[in-house]
Amino acid sequence: MARTKQTARKSTGGKAPRKQLATKAARKSAPATGGVKKPHRFRPGTVALREIRKYQKSTELLIRKLPFQRLVREIAQDFKADLRFQSSAVAALQEASESYLVGLFEDTNLCAIHAKRVTIMPKDIQLARRIRGERA
C-alpha cells in the first residue's frame, strides 16, 4: 500500500460536544436530589501558606496569656515559694519567649531545607541550637 501525503485541513470550530457516560450523569444528578454536599477542601499546602502570611503580618502574642502565666509560676516554684509577678513582668517574659521560639523555628526550617526536606524534625532543632552555641 502506497503512502499518501496528508494535507492540512481548516478546523470547523470548537470541539464537538461529548456524550457523558452513564456514571458521570448519575453522579451529577445525585446532589440535585438531596445528596450530602462534601465540604470544600483546599489543596495540601494552601492553608499552610495562608497561615504563614497571616502570622507574619500579625504582631499579637500567639501563646495564650493564662496558660503561659501558670507555666511561669510553676517554674518559679522550683526556685522560691510564694513569688509574686507583676503583670508587665509576665508579659515581658512571654514576649521574649515567643521571640526566641520564632527565631528558633526559623533556624530549624533553614536546617530542614538544607537537608532537602520541607518537614522539620527534632534533629533540625538540635542542629540549630548547636550552631547557635546554646547546647554542645
Swiss-Prot record:
Record PTM: Acetylation is generally linked to gene activation. Can be acetylated to form H3K9ac, H3K14ac, H3K18ac and H3K23ac. H3K9ac could compete with H3K9me and prevent gene silencing. H3K9ac is restricted to euchromatin. Methylated to form mainly H3K4me, H3K9me, H3K18me, H3K23me, H3K27me and H3K36me. H3K4me1/2/3, H3K9me3, H3K27me3 and H3K36me1/2/3 are typical marks for euchromatin, whereas heterochromatic chromocenters are enriched in H3K9me1/2 and H3K27me1/2. H2BK143ub1 is probably prerequisite for H3K4me.
Compartments where located: Nucleus, Nucleolus; Chromosome
InterPro entries from the UniProt entry: Histone-fold, Histone_H2A/H2B/H3, Histone_H3/CENP-A
Modified residues (Phosphoserine): 11, 29
PROSITE patterns documented for this protein: HISTONE_H3_1 (PS00322), HISTONE_H3_2 (PS00959)
Residues of the signal peptide: none
Residues modified to N6-methylated lysine: 5, 10, 19, 24, 28, 37
A matching Pfam family: Histone
Region: Disordered, residue numbers: 1-43
N6-acetyllysine PTM positions: 10, 15, 19, 24
Top-level taxon in the UniProt lineage: Eukaryota
Gene3D superfamilies reported in the protein's UniProt record: Histone, subunit A
Entry GO terms, CC: nucleolus; nucleosome
UniProt keywords, alphabetically: Acetylation, Chromosome, DNA-binding, Methylation, Nucleosome core, Nucleus, Phosphoprotein
GO molecular function: DNA binding; protein heterodimerization activity; structural constituent of chromatin
Residues annotated with Phosphothreonine modification: 12
S-S bonds: none
Tissue: Expressed in bicellular pollen, root tips, shoot apices, young leaves and ovules.
CDD domains given in the database record: HFD_H3
Homology family: Belongs to the histone H3 family.
Function, in words: Core component of nucleosome. Nucleosomes wrap and compact DNA into chromatin, limiting DNA accessibility to the cellular machineries which require DNA as a template. Histones thereby play a central role in transcription regulation, DNA repair, DNA replication and chromosomal stability. DNA accessibility is regulated via a complex set of post-translational modifications of histones, also called histone code, and nucleosome remodeling.
Assembly behavior: The nucleosome is a histone octamer containing two molecules each of H2A, H2B, H3 and H4 assembled in one H3-H4 heterotetramer and two H2A-H2B heterodimers. The octamer wraps approximately 147 bp of DNA.
UniProt-recorded name of the protein: Histone H3.2
